[in-house]
Amino acid sequence: MNFLPDLGLLAWPLWFLTSGCGEELGWRGFALPRLQRTHSALVSSALLTIGWASWHVPMFFYVPSYLTLGLRIVPGFFLGMFAGATVLTWLYNRSGGSVLAVGLWHASFNFVTASPNAGGLAAAVTSTLVMVWAVIVVWPTRRARRISADYRGTGVALTGAPTQGGSR
């Protein structure tokens, strides 16, 4: 990102749209729907994390903050990527499959955490908030899945809509 000031103010919107939105066309627009055909949202997020984190490995060789931290950042990096993948899967599913929504979220995250003025504190706080958000997203979803299993076959759905085989 250190090259952005040299490109001028007009480069920022282009970077903003391509940095997050460009990636999300592949990760959430292409891969996620295919993974979710056979896996839960959480498992799909975990599988997507492997590819997504691998895609970002080159940053360890050119981003100054990554270079100074060395290999000790890798476990936290993968945990953060999993949290991010979980949040983006949730957002993608909640938005009806909007790649634009996840792309803008991703680009905003990149802007806050990767800008030269962000510093380590902004990146750390933002990443921590994403991890907390991931836990908040996953916990109720897993609990709802257990509750819905208790009601299976009764005709009562958590959505409030009638289910096949019974009425609300």
Locations of the language-model features?
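Membrane-interface capping segments at transmembrane-helix boundaries
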Residues: 138-156
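Functionally important transmembrane alpha-helices
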Residues: 46, 70-130
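Membrane-interface helix-cap regions at the ends of transmembrane helices
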Residues: 53-66
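Residue-level hotspots within the lipid-embedded alpha helices of multi-pass solute transporters
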Residues: 16-21, 53, 77-82
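Hydrophobic core of alpha-helical transmembrane segments in multi-pass integral membrane proteins
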Residues: 126-144
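Membrane-interface helix/loop boundary segments of multi-pass membrane proteins
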Residues: 22-49, 64, 93-98
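Juxtamembrane helix-entry segments on the extracytoplasmic side of multipass membrane proteins
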Residues: 1-13, 65-79
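Short, intrinsically disordered terminal tails adjacent to the first/last structured region
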Residues: 151-168
